[in-house]
């Protein structure tokens, strides 16, 4: 029995045009009117017209005449536009309706400069006010419309009165996941700048902690300031996780004035951070010894490092799923009855959302195939509640490896350029391979 039938059976009427927050959140801010910006071709590598043509081709393949795009990063990528409406994510509040004969952008028109209007007009994109999306959908009564149930609100789903609703995943995330040559070049440039900021930070950190007065929040501010010195810096890509000692065992910890603690010249600091540069998005984690560490810390740190390296050295068939690779990062931990409960890797946007799909590396089955040109994170970890946590993360690129009679094979290249702390390594338990991974930046 579907949810609609259950509601009828129970006498429940679902009002999808009612916003309960309007009654509760009295001082709710309005939708931002921040201006939209063009993502230059030097960074995008493909025009909006070309991307729309690819989307239309994919729609024809499933006998759809059009689709509603609700995911903000999909809209930004398709149109080569960026915004600042969402914290840490360079997107803008909007809807996009791509049909076989028309493309309509529904957005607060106050966001659009004359330059943006001319750009959209040249690309054949009509602009309508954000709150006109329902009217726009009603014009397609004779069409077969694709709606992605993961992204489309039930209210808009119910609004669509067309020949047929094709309920399928949007084709855009899979297109967006494979980076253009220009985007890959942007990652390489941005990683150098981000690496410079990180190396400056690491060189500053230990003396600053030794001198006293540094806390989880203060070092976060220091790192952000160093990144802001770099060319093309726009923002951080997510709120920094700076977890010292037992706070490092809280996977998604975020320091607040109530939880902030001082750093001491001992133990481990887990630092998960990233930046938005106009030519790429970065995401990396380093676990740093601030002074003497225990044998237990060394053992756990070394297991995580082994898992991280094991995944980074992987060679695998084109089209393999992230689930098939996930065990590579966990096997050395499993041998000791240890595990971590978050994903091992996620896609990373190109000056877009730091978390991107559809591909992931995780234990749960993720059928999305891995292809050359995709970016991923490699971030295994181990967390001992009340004690400490360890995570080591690079952003990586999937590349062609070789082709044999058994098909095409892929490999992984690390894009992140930041030293991994060797102080906590238990050198008696690692191999030559573990100790000789190259890095271009040194403290």
Task: Enumerate the predicted regions with their spans.
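Short, compositionally biased
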Residues: 7, 281-298, 389-402
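Conserved small/polar residues in nucleotide/adenosyl-binding loops
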Residues: 1-3, 433-439
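Short acidic, glycine/serine/threonine-rich loops at helix termini
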Residues: 4, 26-30, 78-83, 108-109, ...
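Acidic/histidine-enriched ion/cofactor-binding microenvironments in catalytic or ligand-binding pockets
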Residues: 88-92, 97-100, 249-278, 356-403
């Amino acid at each position: 029995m579907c949810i609609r039938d259950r509601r009828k059976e129970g006498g429940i009427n679902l009002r999808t045009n009612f916003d309960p927050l309007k009654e509760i959140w009295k001082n709710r801010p309005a939708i931002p009117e921040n201006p939209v910006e063009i993502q230059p071709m030097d960074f995008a590598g493909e025009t909006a017209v070309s991307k729309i043509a690819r989307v239309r081709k994919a729609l024809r393949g499933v006998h759809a005449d059009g689709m509603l795009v609700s995911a903000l990063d999909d809209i930004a990528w398709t149109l080569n536009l960026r915004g600042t409406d969402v914290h840490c994510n360079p997107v803008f509040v909007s809807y996009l309706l791509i049909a076989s004969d028309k493309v309509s952008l529904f957005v607060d028109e106050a966001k659009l400069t004359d330059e943006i209007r001319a750009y959209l007009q040249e690309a054949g994109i009509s602009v309508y006010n954000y709150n006109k999306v329902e009217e726009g959908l009603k014009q397609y009564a004779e069409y077969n419309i694709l709606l992605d149930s993961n992204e489309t609100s039930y209210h808009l789903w119910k609004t669509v009165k067309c020949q047929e609703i094709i309920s399928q995943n949007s084709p855009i995330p899979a297109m967006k996941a494979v980076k253009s040559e220009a985007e890959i070049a942007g990652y390489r440039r941005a990683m150098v700048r981000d690496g410079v900021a990180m190396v400056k930070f690491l060189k500053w950190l230990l003396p600053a902690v030794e001198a006293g007065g540094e806390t989880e929040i203060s070092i976060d501010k220091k790192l952000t300031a160093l990144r802001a010195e770099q060319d093309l810096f726009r923002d951080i890509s997510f709120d920094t996780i700076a977890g010292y000692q037992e706070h490092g065992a809280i996977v998604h910890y975020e320091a607040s004035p109530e939880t902030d603690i001082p750093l001491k010249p001992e133990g481990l600091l887990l630092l998960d951070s990233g930046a938005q540069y106009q030519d790429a998005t970065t995401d990396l984690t380093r676990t740093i010894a601030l002074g003497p560490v225990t044998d237990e810390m060394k053992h756990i740190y070394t297991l995580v490092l082994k898992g991280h390296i094991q995944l980074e050295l992987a060679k695998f068939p084109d089209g393999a799923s992230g689930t098939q690779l996930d065990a590579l990062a966990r096997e050395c931990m499993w041998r000791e009855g240890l595990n971590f409960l978050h994903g091992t890797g996620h896609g990373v946007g190109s000056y877009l959302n730091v978390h991107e799909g559809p591909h992931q590396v995780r234990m749960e089955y993720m059928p999305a195939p891995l292809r050359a040109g995709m970016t991923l994170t490699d971030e295994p970890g181990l967390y001992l509640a009340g004690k400490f946590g360890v995570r080591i993360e690079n952003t990586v690129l999937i590349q062609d490896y070789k082709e044999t009679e058994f098909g095409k094979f892929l490999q992984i290249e690390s894009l992140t350029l930041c030293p991994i702390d060797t102080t906590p390594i238990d050198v008696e338990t690692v191999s030559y391979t573990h100790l000789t991974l190259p890095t271009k930046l040194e403290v």
